[in-house]
Amino acid sequence: MQTSDLLRHQLIKSLTTQRPEKGTDAAVDLWTQMAAQLILIIGAGGFDSLYARSVFLSQSTHPWLAARSGPPQTDHRFADLKKSLQAQSPTLARDANCLLLITFTNILASMIGEHLTSRILGSAWDIDTQDTADKEINSA
C-alpha cells in the first residue's frame, strides 16, 4: 500500500485543515491530545524521544522546525513547535505540522502496528477509528 494512501494520513490531513481560524493553537491541540494518550502508555521519555526523532526527520523538508531548546516541561511541551509554526505563513505551518504528525505516527505505527496506532489516535482525537483500522488491515 502506498504511504499516501493510508487512512491515518488522510485523517491527519483532514484534522490539520480544520479550524484554520485557530492557527497554531489548533496544531498544538492535536499534539497535546495525542501526547496525553501516549504518555500514559510509553511514558514522557518515550514520547519525547519519538517527538525529537520526528522533528529531526521533518527538518529535512522544513529546516525551520525547532527542536526543543531544553528539557520539556509538561505545561509547555510544544512551546518550541508553536513558535516555529507562528513564524511561518498559515499554509506552510499547516503543511509542516501535517508532515510532523505523519512522521511521528509512521514511527509509532512501525513500532506498535497500524491498528493500535489508529486506536490511540482515535482515543486522543475523539474519533471512531475502528472502521478505519479495519479497512487498513483488510487492504494490507
Pin down the residues of each PLM region.
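Long, compositionally biased intrinsically disordered regulatory segments in eukaryotic proteins
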Residues: 1-140
